[in-house]
Amino acid sequence: FRALATLAAADQPAIGPAAMAVAERHRQHIEQWFYACPPSLHRGLGELYVQDERFAANIDRYHPGLSAYAREAWQANARRAAGDD
């Protein structure tokens, strides 16, 4: 989440190309090393990162509000993958 935190700290939009690129790298990392992670599932992980206080606390330690920023980037990336951007 460090790359995403850098973007958030620089006020780069979560729906911008740089944040979506980080989101896609994260999704591909999960898919390569853990389990199939289509964009729709990755979008759900973004929701989990915000809704579960344990995830949010862990992610937000990199930058305040980063869990919500990640959720927005993951959602934007999923929309792009579906052609809904």
Show the residue positions of the predicted features.
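Amphipathic alpha-helical "stalk" segments
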Residues: 1-85
